[in-house]
Amino acid sequence: MGSSSLGKWMGAWVKKRYTEAYRDLCTSFIDRGFGMSANNGYSAMVTMQSWMFLGSFEKLRGKIMRNHSISSMAHLGTRAFGAIGGEVVSTTATVFANAKNEVKGAYFRLVDMVSEEEKQAGLLEALANHECGWFYRANASGFEAIPGSPIAYWASNAAMGVFSSAVSFGELANPSAGITTGDNASYIHYWWEEEISNISFTTNDFSSRPTDQKWFPCNKGGAFRKWYGNRENVMAFDDSAINAMRKLPGYRPVNIEKQFKASISWSDITSGRNSFRANGSGNLYDHVGISAFPDEESFNCLLAFLNTSVASTFMILLAPTLHCNAGDLAKLPIVEIKEKNSVNELVNDCIKLCRRDWDAFELSWAFRYHPMI
């Protein structure tokens, strides 16, 4: 239960007593468990896995690494309990040691097993055979090598070492979320719902918006698609729309100076697969169509890297959740990219092919005729 659901009195009480763990009731119990354990004692809990990775629990992870240890963990993931189906509830069973030690904890990665019975059998097999492929040994203090200190027990020493020598993606491209309208039903539409003459496709700067057009292309994320596409939405962003949105409690006009700039974009919700696309200038972006803004020289190389399995592997270390937010992506390590000219040519080809595919069907505002004709 998140802190926002605790109620005013209880929320304040928990925040005062569990300053590193108050964001969720289950993490407050983790902290309380240390207080109830004897020195060198243990506490064991089944909790949501969110504390292992999310930025809001970074202080709790830091406290565990500084003052305590993880003796063992069965990382259950989703579908750990037959009575709770679906992909939403992700859990972990952890034995915490109330002492700082250098003993490597035992970790059982059961997240890829799809039922309670499979996870039970997998745990028993790992106990009998440490070479099974889902058993790991790791010292909790080693997680501090990764930005945000996620409990990425499966990370190799080589992978963790990259973070110390590489430049972060955030330094090169400044990823960020965009505008929250406060009322998408009124202010974000599909482009075919509006008169095409009332949509501006060529605006390059907020201050130079035309006064005679109300709608502008808007990157709003969308389904899995690499390189180019998901260009379906427009946002009302003329002066009258902005003035109306300002009256809405949910309106958040963030990063206005980046609107209409060329960007790399992706969807906040990924279903486990990341896909990154090139957006030329002329587009707005909202809070779920997150975007990054590298310079022209590094644009294609960074887009190429983001669409690789290597980037996906590092993203799973940083945030193995259904969300791919700007803060997590900013932590991706970027090493020097060799063969830049070849990469640029290949990326241009990928964008060209995917654009041709997107424009071949009626969802594209650039559609002219079906490719079979």
PLM feature segments, named:
Residues 205-257, 265:
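Contiguous C-terminal substrate-recognition/catalytic subdomains in enzyme active sites
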Residues 78-81, 224, 271:
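Short beta-turn/strand-loop junction motif enriched in small, turn-promoting residues
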Residues 85-93, 333-335, 349, 353-356, ...:
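Acidic/histidine-rich catalytic neighborhood
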Residues 1-206, 230, 240, 244-247, ...:
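Signature of N6-adenine DNA methyltransferases within the class I
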Residues 219, 257-275, 302-316:
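Short Ser/Thr-interspersed hydrophobic loop/turn segments at strand-loop and sheet-helix junctions
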